[in-house]
């Protein structure tokens, strides 16, 4: 672009420097080449790594509460079960209300910005390539909570369908009722399934 006259040498050098920094950020985190073969016991934030995730493929209930993306509060809010320092930030960029913070370092664990108000649009849920984000409303209805999750199976369930909700480990947890199924081009072929479950 410089030799064609679109940008000058100073701007080119600045752009190349920014690209080098961004590329270096993508080579960081617990799965970075420099960490190959190393036993990582804590996240960059000092939180114990989920050993269940690494050995069984899911985060155990007693482990998930220690991560910053799992708040408890009234009203609809995101719950991010992202427990590893990996270079990823689509959820932060997708949220129109800036409810999700990752910060300057792309490998930081996502956290909910308590000063922002979630509108329940679901963009964060649809944008997460790891399918690790849910929208939860613990005060959906007297005695019931709602959970919105990514859904990529066919056929799509219908509002009013009933079934059994499963936990992270695949075990039966409780009865569930489908209260909505949303599909949109903005969700990039990921549907958002919202179920109603007992609050307990």
What annotation goes with each model-predicted range?
Residues 183-197:
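Short, solvent-exposed secondary-structure boundary/capping segments
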Residues 156-158:
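Short, well-ordered loop/turn sites that connect or cap secondary structure elements
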Residues 35-116:
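N-terminal intrinsically disordered, low-complexity, charge/repeat-rich segments that act as generic
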Residues 1-2, 89-107, 123-139:
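Iron-sulfur cluster-binding cysteine motifs and their immediate structural context
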Residues 140-149:
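Short, structured beta-strand/loop micro-motifs enriched in basic residues and often containing a Trp
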Residues 132, 167-172:
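Short, charged beta-turn/beta-strand-edge "cap" motif at the junction between a beta-strand
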Residues 171-185:
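Short beta-strand-centered aromatic/proline hotspots
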């Amino acid at each position: 672009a410089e030799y064609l006259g679109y940008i000058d040498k100073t701007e080119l050098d600045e752009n190349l420097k920014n690209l080098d920094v961004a590329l270096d950020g993508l080579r960081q985190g617990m799965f970075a080449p420099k960490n190959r073969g190393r036993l990582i016991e804590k996240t960059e934030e000092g939180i114990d790594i989920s050993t269940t995730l690494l050995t069984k493929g899911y985060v155990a209930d007693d482990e998930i509460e220690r991560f910053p993306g799992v708040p408890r509060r009234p009203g609809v809010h995101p719950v991010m079960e992202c427990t590893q320092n990996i270079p990823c930030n689509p959820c932060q960029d997708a949220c129109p209300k800036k409810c999700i913070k990752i910060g300057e370092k792309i490998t930081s664990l996502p956290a909910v910005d308590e000063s922002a108000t979630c509108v329940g649009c679901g963009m964060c849920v649809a944008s997460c390539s790891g399918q690790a984000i849910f929208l939860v409303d613990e005060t959906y209805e007297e005695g019931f909570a709602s959970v919105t999750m990514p859904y990529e199976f066919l056929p799509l369930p219908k509002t009013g369908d009933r079934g059994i909700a499963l936990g992270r480990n695949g075990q039966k947890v409780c009865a569930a009722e489908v209260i909505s199924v949303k599909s949109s081009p903005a969700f990039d072929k990921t549907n958002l399934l919202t179920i109603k479950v007992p609050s307990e």
